[in-house]
């Protein structure tokens, strides 16, 4: 069983058909998610002083269109993650994403946005390879210093469907060359940088 994301894992998103692609996700990607979950969730639990549970996306609502990406999440809620600030690891066909995510299902979204607006210095202090996104369904992300961060956070506050995600994107080529140990080290390092934001923005 593979314990890291191979080129084949990223090629999964070229497979036609919902069932065929889901079979490949279960075979090539989800075992790696499980392994990452076992290693990373105890770290987050310690660092956050609250239990963090692993959720692996099952794409159960899909009936026709195959998913363009897939992910796992770490959340303080055993039953779900979408209504809570949470940490994600996932793949599109060309990159890995490692996020702290505030998505549109989050209740009291405007309160989180206001706190982020009041603590933008936490975001500007992140390493230069960190990026932000305002829509988890889109591949694109922007460097934090280039974004008009305030404008994006205002939109996150005021627009119901707007989101805020911050973390790292790593190319498929780079990820597929990594060992399992290097991959987990990268995820841990990314989350270590994001934990202070998670704690502050409650």
From Swiss-Prot:
The UniProt entry, under SUPFAM superfamilies, shows:
YktB/PF0168-like (SSF142913)
Coiled coil region boundaries: none
Q: What is this protein called?
A: UPF0637 protein Exig_2520
InterPro entries annotated for this entry? UPF0637, UPF0637_domain_sf
Q: Which domain of life is it from?
A: Bacteria
Organism of origin: Exiguobacterium sibiricum (strain DSM 17290 / CCUG 55495 / CIP 109462 / JCM 13490 / 255-15)
Q: Name one Pfam family in it.
A: DUF1054
Tell me which family the UniProt entry assigns to this protein: Belongs to the UPF0637 family.
């Amino acid at each position: 069983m593979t314990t890291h994301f191979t080129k084949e894992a990223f090629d999964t998103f070229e497979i036609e058909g919902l069932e065929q692609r889901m079979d490949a996700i279960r075979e090539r990607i989800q075992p790696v998610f499980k392994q990452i979950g076992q290693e990373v969730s105890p770290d987050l639990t310690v660092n956050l002083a609250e239990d963090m549970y692993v959720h692996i996306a099952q794409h159960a609502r899909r009936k026709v269109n195959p998913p363009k990406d897939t992910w796992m999440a770490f959340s303080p809620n055993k039953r779900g993650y979408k209504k809570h600030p949470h940490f994600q690891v996932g793949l599109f066909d060309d990159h890995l994403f490692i996020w702290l995510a505030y998505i549109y299902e989050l209740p009291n979204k405007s309160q989180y946005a206001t706190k982020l607006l009041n603590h933008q210095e936490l975001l500007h202090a992140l390493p230069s390879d960190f990026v932000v996104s305002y829509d988890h369904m889109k591949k694109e992300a922007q460097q934090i210093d280039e974004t008009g961060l305030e404008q994006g956070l205002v939109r996150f506050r005021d627009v119901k469907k707007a989101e805020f995600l911050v973390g790292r994107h790593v190319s498929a080529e780079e990820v597929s060359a990594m060992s399992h140990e290097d991959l987990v080290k990268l995820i841990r390092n990314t989350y270590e940088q994001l934990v202070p934001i998670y704690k502050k923005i409650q």
